[in-house]
């Protein structure tokens, strides 16, 4: 049997999403708060919660403009044809089906699991608005997979993190849409993971055979250099410590799930600790 290469941690960052995805469907009270794109002098910018976050179709989760020499791997992408065009009408490669498939073929990747908009729940303050924004993305992601290749492209749903009942309902809805799993942002959850109210979500995930992933976004308890001068002098040391501790925040997730009793109560509930090495995930 031929070995297959499957990426378990690809992404669609917010910067690459369709510019009118949320603003075209937003209730009047949220029109200026939901993720939306405005055209400025240097191109289109994303605004979230009425704050300018940076470029549409920019570089990665930081919404950055492309600058040669900053990131070597970004320069390599540029050399093989990846373009960052900030004007309306551009086709971002990560969210244009035929271009995404072409990039998978170029890299020799047979299939991919896609995390989406990891920071969106950090950028939106209101819980109800976050939940709504998640559902809009999830519907789009299911359609995107079908328009690409549903046997190769597997987007994860963004699971609402403000209310366990909303999260459970969204899991059931997304399972019906054809999505195969979801990502739960645990940094701004309405309740701690070990709280019994989250049983509603674990039950829905087990019922729908819908694994829940927790993707690390970095350990927030790390001490940073005291001054810009110190940061410059100890740049390598600080980056080394930060990189070594990056996945430490998912230890909170693992211990919280074990302490909650979820694994005993829902043995068919499966979970994944994203960017945290390899482990046997699942409660059963």
Give residue spans per PLM region:
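Helix-coil boundary/capping segments in enzymes
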Residues: 1-284
